[in-house]
Amino acid sequence: MRHRKSGRHLNRTSSHRHAMFKNMCVSLVEHEVIKTTLPKAKELRRHIEPLITLAKQDSVANRRLAFNRTRSKEAVGKLFNELGPRYVERPGGYVRILKCGFRAGDNAPMAYVELVDRPVVEEAAEE
């Protein structure tokens, strides 16, 4: 029985799942918006929100915890230098999931995962 076992398996082994969400967390921190399937997006939220909460208090111990979860120095640097200070006043809910239709090949529901309150980049195409 699978009583009280939370989280989606996503038809992957445990190690594959952990590696995938580690990579997705690093990509989201780096780009601040990514496109993925809806179930992966919903599960990613459970991984990235605690990381950002950790980054709100800058300490060596928290940086080491974040590095152990991401294995990326660049991601940890951005988490603690940019994202942590950005979300100090926000008590959670750092991620927005926007549905964006279905994938052409297999009709899988797709979604954008983005960090809320991210700076808007003015496009050069408007000129």
Swiss-Prot record:
SUPFAM superfamilies: Prokaryotic ribosomal protein L17
Any Pfam family hit: Ribosomal_L17
Gene Ontology process terms (BP): translation
Gene3D superfamilies reported in the protein's UniProt record: Ribosomal protein L17
GO CC, one annotated term: cytosolic large ribosomal subunit
Key word Disulfide bond present: no
Keywords: Ribonucleoprotein, Ribosomal protein
Sample GO molecular function, one term: structural constituent of ribosome
Domain of life: Bacteria
Subunit: Part of the 50S ribosomal subunit. Contacts protein L32.
Family the entry assigns: Belongs to the bacterial ribosomal protein bL17 family.
Protein known as: Large ribosomal subunit protein bL17
Species of the source: Chromohalobacter salexigens (strain ATCC BAA-138 / DSM 3043 / CIP 106854 / NCIMB 13768 / 1H11)
Gene of this entry: rplQ
